[in-house]
């Protein structure tokens, strides 16, 4: 893990702006040549929050949360559910952990390293081999087909064989949508494509932000099974967020945001 597979092409990108504008899991693939984080441990074991709080909540005195203003640890190999009400900072939490935003108070650290000290190249490296993210808003490319959205990432990571990807499409009931543009698919179908894309890379933690909000019970259950099978095979931790509807899994700990 952490090494570029042989015979896998890559796009050299010296533009920080381009990396930032791409979804984190896609943008990561554009930096195979980036230097490693100094002292970076190849496997990330813990994500820790200490008195973290979105700055927008700083003047509020009514915060009642099991995450904000608390000391919280997410450990590799474990399964967590973060339940939230609207406007409580659920997506902000994901954005902080994935490095998209830093407008928070307190400390967030990976294996005791304060993430505020990470530079863009460091985040690229983390997203390449340690963090995968299923966005609530998905961030798929509408002009590309379902398979192309997955392949654009997998071609760069070289992590999964085409046969495995197609098997996931079939299992999730979208095997007939492989070559259909994303713009012509329902949001629920797009959610399944986004999940597959999130799985075609190595990761120590997977953040799934409302992954089944538009799925029926059967597809939600299948997605959960596929997600957990891949996470277990990598020994990874999984953090699922929800505003009510969530994947029925054996969560080891549930936090009320």
Please provide the spans of the model-predicted regions:
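Helix-to-loop junction immediately C-terminal to a conserved catalytic motif
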Residues: 98
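Conserved ABC transporter NBD signature motif
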Residues: 106-116
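ABC ATPase NBD coupling module
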Residues: 115-132
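Conserved ABC ATPase "signature" region
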Residues: 162-177
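Conserved ABC ATPase signature
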Residues: 181-191
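Hydrophobic anchor residue at the start of the ABC signature
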Residues: 195
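Catalytic Walker B motif of ABC-type/P-loop ATPase nucleotide-binding domains
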Residues: 206-209
């Amino acid at each position: 893990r952490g090494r570029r597979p042989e015979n896998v092409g890559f796009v050299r990108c010296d533009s920080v702006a381009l990396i930032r504008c791409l979804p984190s899991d896609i943008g990561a693939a554009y930096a195979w040549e980036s230097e490693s984080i100094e002292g970076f441990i190849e496997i990330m074991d813990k994500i820790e929050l200490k008195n973290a709080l979105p700055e927008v909540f700083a003047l509020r005195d009514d915060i009642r949360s099991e995450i904000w203003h608390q000391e919280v640890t997410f450990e590799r190999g474990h399964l967590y559910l973060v339940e939230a009400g609207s406007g409580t900072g659920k997506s902000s939490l994901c954005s902080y952990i994935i490095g998209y935003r830093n407008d928070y108070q307190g400390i967030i650290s990976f294996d005791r390293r304060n993430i505020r000290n990470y530079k863009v190249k460091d985040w690229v490296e983390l997203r390449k081999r340690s963090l995968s993210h299923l966005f609530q808003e998905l961030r798929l490319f509408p002009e590309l087909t379902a398979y192309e959205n997955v392949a654009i990432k997998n071609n760069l990571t070289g992590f999964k064989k085409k046969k495995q990807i197609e098997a996931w499409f079939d299992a999730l009931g979208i095997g007939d949508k492989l070559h259909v543009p994303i713009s012509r698919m329902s949001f629920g179908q797009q959610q399944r494509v986004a999940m597959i894309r999130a799985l075609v890379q190595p990761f120590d933690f997977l953040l799934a932000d409302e992954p089944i909000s538009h799925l029926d019970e059967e597809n939600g259950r299948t997605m959960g099974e596929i997600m957990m099978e891949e996470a277990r095979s990598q020994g990874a931790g999984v953090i699922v967020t929800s505003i009510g509807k969530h994947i029925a899994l054996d969560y080891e700990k549930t936090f009320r945001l």
